[in-house]
């Protein structure tokens, strides 16, 4: 079962609405859903909520360390409360998924995501769960940093918010350790992928 839910992002009003903060948006939504308000806890370098569900303690964590050193916050809380890596779920922005889609994944590469990279290093393993929230790709690698640190269009923001709401429906399964069920709930609730525009033949 998942005992620690983490949302990645950067602290500060200037980053609040940027694509890189999609993980923050999700953990805020989960906090509201569980009625577990996040409060600052300097021991864990972030905002923390603790709640009890079905007799079991569940933690929510929003690192305030800046994205590139998120692992410091995650590892501090996980180690103190003896939460194993495979009991951790990290919600983060994902370039390789279009806005409006979300994927659940266990383990694997950080794929260049600096927040995940630091969590890998601090936990000493990549064996934790990720909730990959699609924010789309600018199409050019050189534009990636600028892309994630900008606000999405209104259309994309709405699509991201909708997928965040859908992913919340899998939380009971995640808490119960029913990971196959959670995966199915998340992956089968996706909207259809937009079709590319049809090519029209030039008239004679």
Swiss-Prot record:
Region (Disordered) location: 185-204
Cited CDD domains: PTH (cd00462)
GO molecular function, a single term: peptidyl-tRNA hydrolase activity
Keyword terms, alphabetized: Cytoplasm, Hydrolase, RNA-binding, tRNA-binding
EC number: 3.1.1.29
Top enzyme category: hydrolase
GO CC term, one of those recorded: cytoplasm
Annotated residues for binding of tRNA: 15, 66, 68, 114
Marked site: Discriminates between blocked and unblocked aminoacyl-tRNA: 10
Subcellular location: Cytoplasm
An example Gene Ontology biological process: rescue of stalled ribosome
Active site as annotated: 20 (proton acceptor)
SUPFAM superfamilies reported in the protein's UniProt record: Peptidyl-tRNA hydrolase-like
Reactions mediated catalytically: an N-acyl-L-alpha-aminoacyl-tRNA + H2O = an N-acyl-L-amino acid + a tRNA + H(+)
Site positions for Stabilizes the basic form of H active site to accept a proton: 93
Gene3D superfamilies xref list: Peptidyl-tRNA hydrolase (3.40.50.1470)
Classification via InterPro entries: Pept_tRNA_hydro, Pept_tRNA_hydro_CS, Pept_tRNA_hydro_sf
Subunit details: Monomer.
Family membership noted in the UniProt record: Belongs to the PTH family.
Main function: Hydrolyzes ribosome-free peptidyl-tRNAs (with 1 or more amino acids incorporated), which drop off the ribosome during protein synthesis, or as a result of ribosome stalling. Catalyzes the release of premature peptidyl moieties from peptidyl-tRNA molecules trapped in stalled 50S ribosomal subunits, and thus maintains levels of free tRNAs and 50S ribosomes.
Protein name: Peptidyl-tRNA hydrolase
Species of origin: Polaromonas sp. (strain JS666 / ATCC BAA-500)
Record gene name: pth
